[in-house]
Amino acid sequence: MKRKAVLEAFSDSEDEDEKKLKGPQLITGFSAEEGVHYQNETIQRIHEKKRAPKIIHIASDENWMEKRKARFKKKETEVHEKPSQLPDSGLNYGLNIRVASSSAADNEIVDWKANNSNEKAQNKIATNKESTDILPEEVQLVLNDLNDDVKSANSANLQPITTNVVNEKDAYRKDIDELPEPSNMKDYSEIPVEEFGAAMLRGMGWNGQLSSKDAFDVNQRPTFLGMGAKPVDSELTELDIWKNPKKTMFLPVKPLESNSALNSQNEHTEVQKKSNSIDNLTPSSELFRKRSRDNNLSRESSVSSKHLDYNSRNYNKRDRDPDRTKYREYHSERRKQHRTDRYSDDYYQGRSYSYKKRSHRSDRYTERENPDRSYRSTRTL
């Protein structure tokens, strides 16, 4: 409710200021820092208030988890006081050295006083019981009431059970009541979009100054550039790159200093001379003789390489087994004899049927001439 009242008060004042600014006003001057200067001081104050930097105050950083735990936490029913000092056990192992200490003497005195007080209290209770038995009933009732009051006073020292447990519905209602009021269109119009971020930073404590560190510029990587590669300086021309070549396997070819046009012309003339000399060859010319002699030599060398003798291959110079050479010569002669004998008529006599080619042909002719004669009979003969 308080928040609503404050907002209504501010809204009323803002409405009045807007009404004042709507009418015609006298302007005395302009400036880059302050802007327009009005003659009326109240209007000038309203204008400066609008030009002031906007601030969006942010709520404190509250830990809502801890807040929720504290809300739904159950406290202990009783808190028992711990003894100041635990009694020392009588058993001590190892080397025992008695040291006179003031604390031990104080403990003995405290224990003696406590024992005396307990004995006195017990004696009082016993005497009271004995005396109450002697007293009349009315007096005994009054004494019992007094004893009950004393017991209740002693029990007041104990902490009562204080459960701070809240239902989910109550907690939800409380959170809704603590929520701020929703923003209106008027609130959005007061803070422009371009000033929203700066207003939030001012609410967090920003003083409006930029940091001393230089901003990091994110440069986009060039296309088709591999990982770890560096782009070539675009300022250097191709000629500047070739002046200072790096030590690499590739060696650029430098152009000749002479004029390329003259060189090409000289080459053309030389080629033309050669072509003319080849066309004008005659059997009597020396060039023709040289060419023919070279051709004959090359032809003879090719023929001799195809038909080399056994001795020309230098097989006899090698250390070979003489029996192997004899065996090779014997079989070579036998193959030659076989080639000459296979075309004679007596070569296939006495061999198997697979070699009787000539007899097979003759049998075919006999079948045509004498059909009554069987082909198998001729085969078996």
From Swiss-Prot:
Localization terms from the record: Nucleus
Modified residues (Phosphoserine): 11, 13, 275, 277
This protein's UniProt keywords: Coiled coil, mRNA processing, mRNA splicing, Nucleus, Phosphoprotein, Spliceosome
Domain of life: Eukaryota
InterPro entries cross-referenced by the UniProt entry: Spp2-like, Spp2/MOS2_G-patch
Bias (Basic and acidic residues) ranges: 287-297, 306-332, 362-375
Ranges of biased composition (kind: Polar residues): 274-285
GO CC, any one term: spliceosomal complex
Family per record: Belongs to the SPP2 family.
Protein name: Pre-mRNA-splicing factor cwf28
Source lineage: Eukaryota, Fungi, Dikarya, Ascomycota, Taphrinomycotina
Originating gene: cwf28
